[in-house]
């Protein structure tokens, strides 16, 4: 039995020394020291020895067992240390390397245009006001002199939530709300989101608009033209031609469409301006007396003007963008151009 124990120990020590992983060491532990292991089988054979041999052989078995357990544990620690070192080497990070710059976002072109227009009118004494996007019929239509049978009140043009509740079709309701809260003089611009039932390459069911108005004593149509000409020259460039054409809006009288010399051909005539040399950018006019009556102003003692423009419209002209849908596609390649 002594020779058997010596052979078993030498064989086990050799295999333990050659083990390269925790799994291999675990298999050796089970093979030699498990319930059905080889050393366990030797221990079970002690009962067949004589009483004189049994204590001596039992001590030898325990010595071999202790030696194997100690060697297994030491080898396991070395294997774990080697594996950890290899992993750390593989995952090593050179802290002296320069960091990676995170890509920075940019402002959306619509936001850029709103900020630029707001800054221009702030320099002319206008303040920014805002209002709700879900609006009452009174503020969106009735107080702005839209008759009950006006086409804009039709569901084909307006998103109605209820009979008297809708998604505002313009930012003009802010004009009414402001005049109800404040006595003249007032100078306000109101940028915001508006909604209409329309969608194609040049129209979107949701878009952005800026309404502006000024009310005071002695405000004239000449003041309106002067302020809008000033805006055009700051926004599109000095010397940009401006013209006003007669038009109609329910809440202004007289009313005008404001055109600028085509930014593509400089007024010479091209496909964009349909050879006319002019591009429409906004509507404007003197505020109708009926609007004053709805807000409690005296139309005999004050006067004022209002104007409104689509932000996407002027942004497309300023940056030469041909399709309105690009503003809403979230294409990073498009948006990164506006820095």
From Swiss-Prot:
Coiled coil: none annotated. Keywords: Aminoacyl-tRNA synthetase, ATP-binding, Cytoplasm, Ligase, Magnesium, Metal-binding, Nucleotide-binding, Protein biosynthesis. Binds 2 magnesium ions per tetramer. The keyword Signal does not apply. Its cofactor is Mg(2+). SUPFAM superfamilies: Class II aaRS and biotin synthetases, tRNA-binding arm. It catalyses: tRNA(Phe) + L-phenylalanine + ATP = L-phenylalanyl-tRNA(Phe) + AMP + diphosphate + H(+). CDD domains: PheRS_alpha_core. Its EC number is 6.1.1.20. It is an enzyme of class 6 (ligase). One of its GO terms (biological process) is phenylalanyl-tRNA aminoacylation. GO terms for cellular component: cytoplasm. One of its GO terms (molecular function) is tRNA binding. PROSITE patterns: AA_TRNA_LIGASE_II. It is found in: Cytoplasm. Mg(2+) binds at residue 253. Pfam families: Phe_tRNA-synt_N, tRNA-synt_2d. The keyword Protein biosynthesis applies. Belongs to the class-II aminoacyl-tRNA synthetase family. Phe-tRNA synthetase alpha subunit type 1 subfamily. Tetramer of two alpha and two beta subunits. HAMAP family: Phe_tRNA_synth_alpha1 (MF_00281). This is Phenylalanine--tRNA ligase alpha subunit.
């Amino acid at each position: 039995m002594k020779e058997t124990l010596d052979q078993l120990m030498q064989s086990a020590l050799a295999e333990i020394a050659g083990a390269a992983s925790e799994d291999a060491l675990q298999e050796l532990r089970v093979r030699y020291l498990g319930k059905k292991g080889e050393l366990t089988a030797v221990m079970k054979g002690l009962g067949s020895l004589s009483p004189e041999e049994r204590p001596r052989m039992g001590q030898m078995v325990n010595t071999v067992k202790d030696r194997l357990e100690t060697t297994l544990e030491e080898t396991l620690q070395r294997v774990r240390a080697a594996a950890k070192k290899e992993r750390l080497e593989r995952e090593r990070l050179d802290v002296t390397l320069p960091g990676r710059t995170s890509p920075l976002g940019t402002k959306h072109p619509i936001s850029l245009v709103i900020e630029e227009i707001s800054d221009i009118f702030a320099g002319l004494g206008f303040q920014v006001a805002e209002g709700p996007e879900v609006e009452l019929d009174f503020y969106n239509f009735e107080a702005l002199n839209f008759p009950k049978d006006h086409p804009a009140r039709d569901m084909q043009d307006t998103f109605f939530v209820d009979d008297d509740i809708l998604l505002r079709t313009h930012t003009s309701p802010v004009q009414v709300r402001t005049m109800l809260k404040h006595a003249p003089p007032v100078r306000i611009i109101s940028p915001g989101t508006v909604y209409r039932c329309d969608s194609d390459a040049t129209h979107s069911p949701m878009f952005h608009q800026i309404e502006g108005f000024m009310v005071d004593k002695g405000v004239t149509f000449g003041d309106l033209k002067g302020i809008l000409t000033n805006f055009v020259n700051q926004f599109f460039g000095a010397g940009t031609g401006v013209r006003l054409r007669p038009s109609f809006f329910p809440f202004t009288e007289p009313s005008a469409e404001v055109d600028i010399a085509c930014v593509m051909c400089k007024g010479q005539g091209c496909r964009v301006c349909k050879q006319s040399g002019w591009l429409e950018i906004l509507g404007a006019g003197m505020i109708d007396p009926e609007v004053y009556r709805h807000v409690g102003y005296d139309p005999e003692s004050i006067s004022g003007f209002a104007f409104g423009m689509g932000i996407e419209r002027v942004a497309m002209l300023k940056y030469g963008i041909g399709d309105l849908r690009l503003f809403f596609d979230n294409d990073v390649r498009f948006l990164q151009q506006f820095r």
